[in-house]
């Protein structure tokens, strides 16, 4: 097992904190500046928001379109409470648990792989509560 250097871990954590701040501020330019030009993002939302078959966005320009829609359509259950994160010097992983201070929130786990100080791959995994909320939104959109 390779133990990451403090420098590598610090760089990954810096990207994570900068991304978290940009997400909280809904700052599209700041968040996009943290991704490699050929970055990928995998999420259940990709198919829904971009209307494509695959759940993967490739490239910063396509990612910008997705993140702009996420910022515009974020449901109230998408709070951002988390207890911390894990990093191995190349990737960072964190969880938004369903049970959070103040009630339930969307249960999500995210993983980012960092290359040369920028996000290369970003994967988003949903728990059952997030899927349930998504299905309810889909149902109400069809009925509305």
Give the residues covered by each predicted segment.
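Basic side chains
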Residues: 26, 60, 122-123
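Short, low-complexity N-terminal intrinsically disordered segments enriched in polar/charged residues
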Residues: 1-37, 139-144
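A beta-strand edge to alpha-helix "cap/lid" segment located at domain peripheries
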Residues: 1-7, 64, 68-144
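Generic alpha-helix detector with strongest preference for long hydrophobic helices that associate
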Residues: 12-16, 44-48, 93, 100
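A solvent-exposed, acidic/Ser-Thr-rich amphipathic alpha-helical stretch
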Residues: 9, 30-88
């Amino acid at each position: 097992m390779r133990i990451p250097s403090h420098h590598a871990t610090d760089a990954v954590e810096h990207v994570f904190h900068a991304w978290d701040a940009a997400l909280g501020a809904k700052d599209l330019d700041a968040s996009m500046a943290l991704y490699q030009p050929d970055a990928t993002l995998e999420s259940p939302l990709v198919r829904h928001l971009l209307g494509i078959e695959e759940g993967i966005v490739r490239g910063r320009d396509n990612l910008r379109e997705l993140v702009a829609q996420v910022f515009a359509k974020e449901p109230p259950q998408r709070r951002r409470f988390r207890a911390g994160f894990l990093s191995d010097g190349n990737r960072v992983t964190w969880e938004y648990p369903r049970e959070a201070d103040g009630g339930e929130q969307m249960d999500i786990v995210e993983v980012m792989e960092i290359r040369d100080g920028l996000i290369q791959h970003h994967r988003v995994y949903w728990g059952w509560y997030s899927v349930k909320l998504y299905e309810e939104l889909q149902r109400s959109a069809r009925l509305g």
